[in-house]
């Protein structure tokens, strides 16, 4: 009996660790895809920024078309029906020149960590509440520099609501708990 109790307690601790690691693990994986996406979009956005009119550039046109393009994807039992990325581009001073949500153009984002750190040659990321009264409304942003040769000319930041990851996290936690119940 003592052996089974010891095994049960050990299994409970292992299970608790697994469940606690699901959320940060999913967020770390998402952060990795955000930096890849930001870096790619920064390269694609360079001509838009150099043109002096990024609000009418290829990136802006692509996001405009994306908003009107329906899509459906069933990803492991989780339905996805819209783009969840929020993308904005700043100049080298941190002034927003393009915003996929059309809310921040002209604003100074130079003090936001994602922009501030990227403008200083560092890895720039932040998590911000969309609604200060709702702790579940956080959005993770990761930024990449927009370069013209060796000169930093701007920052492109990609954000994704943490709530968009909630179904994956909840499903993973349920599966771990269900599997442990079988054991």
Identify what each model region corresponds to.
Residues 1-19, 181-182:
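Extreme N-terminal signal-anchor transmembrane helix of membrane signaling/transducer proteins, especially
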Residues 2, 27, 170-182:
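Internal alpha-helical transmembrane segments of multi-pass membrane proteins, especially GPCRs
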Residues 17-45, 172-175:
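Juxtamembrane membrane-water interface segments immediately C-terminal to a transmembrane helix
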Residues 56-74, 84, 95, 99-136:
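Extracytoplasmic/periplasmic sensor domains and loops in membrane signaling proteins
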Residues 132, 147-149, 157-176:
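Helix-start (N-cap) segments at beta->loop->alpha junctions
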Residues 135-145:
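A short beta-strand signature within small-molecule sensing/ligand-binding domains used
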């Amino acid at each position: 009996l003592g052996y089974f109790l010891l095994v049960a307690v050990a299994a409970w601790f292992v299970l608790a660790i697994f469940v606690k690691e699901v959320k940060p693990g999913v967020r770390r994986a998402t952060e990795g895809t955000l930096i890849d996406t930001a870096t790619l979009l920064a390269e694609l956005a360079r001509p838009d920024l150099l043109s002096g009119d990024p609000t009418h550039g290829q990136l802006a046109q692509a996001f405009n078309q994306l908003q009107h393009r329906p899509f459906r994807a069933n990803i492991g039992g989780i339905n996805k029906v819209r783009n969840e990325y929020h993308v904005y581009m700043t100049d080298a001073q941190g002034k927003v020149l393009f915003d996929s949500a059309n809310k921040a153009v002209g604003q100074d984002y130079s003090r936001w960590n994602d922009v501030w750190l990227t403008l200083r040659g560092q890895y720039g990321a932040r998590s911000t509440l969309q609604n200060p009264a709702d702790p579940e409304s956080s959005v993770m942003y990761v930024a990449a520099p927009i370069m013209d040769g060796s000169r930093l000319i701007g920052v492109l930041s990609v954000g994704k609501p943490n709530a968009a990851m909630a179904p994956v996290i909840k499903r993973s936690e349920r599966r771990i708990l269900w599997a442990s119940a079988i054991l």
